[in-house]
Amino acid sequence: MKPPLRVVVVTESFLPQVNGVTNSVLRVLEHLRAEGHQALVIAPESSGGITEYAGFRVKRVPSLEMKGLLPVGFPQKAIEPLIDGFNPDVIHLASPFFLGNYASRVAERLDIPTLSVYQTDIAGFARHYGLTVAHDSLKRWVAKIHKRTTRTLAPSNWSCEDLKSTGV
């Protein structure tokens, strides 16, 4: 029997927000629990945010909440000792942006493999909401994060092709 894995899950979105990223993270955590693994979740602070899910601790980090938008978590130095103290085998980055970018850098410093999931077209959202000028910069930012990770998963052919178009 294999020893349980220790997984840090860093997510840009978590309960009480309900969306594709949150739902995917919940399924990952439920699977980790069912398989006897250990996990720690790092997520943005949010009004009504829970501090435990499936028996796993959810560590909330300061965030900016704006009406109608997801809370944006702020990377902070306290994340590194939290990750280091948990001694993970892998860091799972769920739709990485600000927190995920910081966690990927921590993983590099601590020599911890990372798994990122590309499931939010942040640049596309920017274009949709009239921030066309930010599109290319956001595309490069997200690509840079995924290029840094050990492995990237893409949940659809479209997202896979989108990543490939940026050199990932």
Stretch-by-stretch model annotation:
Residues V25-V28, A103, S159:
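Hydrophobic residues within alpha-helices
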Residues E65-R105, R109, D136, R140:
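An amphipathic, basic-hydrophobic alpha-helix
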Residues S47, F98-L99, W158-C160:
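Alpha-helix capping/helix-boundary segments
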Residues M1-R60:
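N-terminal subdomain of nucleotide-sugar transferases
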